[in-house]
Amino acid sequence: GLVGEIISRGDFAIDIGR
């Protein structure tokens, strides 16, 4: 999200937050 963060897990990333 814009005020979230990117969590890298293996070969993919998850964009969390609003």
Curated annotation (Swiss-Prot):
The keyword Transport does not apply. Keywords: ATP-binding, Kinase, Magnesium, Metal-binding, Nucleotide metabolism, Nucleotide-binding, Phosphoprotein, Transferase. Its EC number is 2.7.4.6. Signal peptide: none annotated. Major role in the synthesis of nucleoside triphosphates other than ATP. The ATP gamma phosphate is transferred to the NDP beta phosphate via a ping-pong mechanism, using a phosphorylated active-site intermediate. Belongs to the NDK family. This is Nucleoside diphosphate kinase 1. It comes from Pseudotsuga menziesii (Douglas-fir).
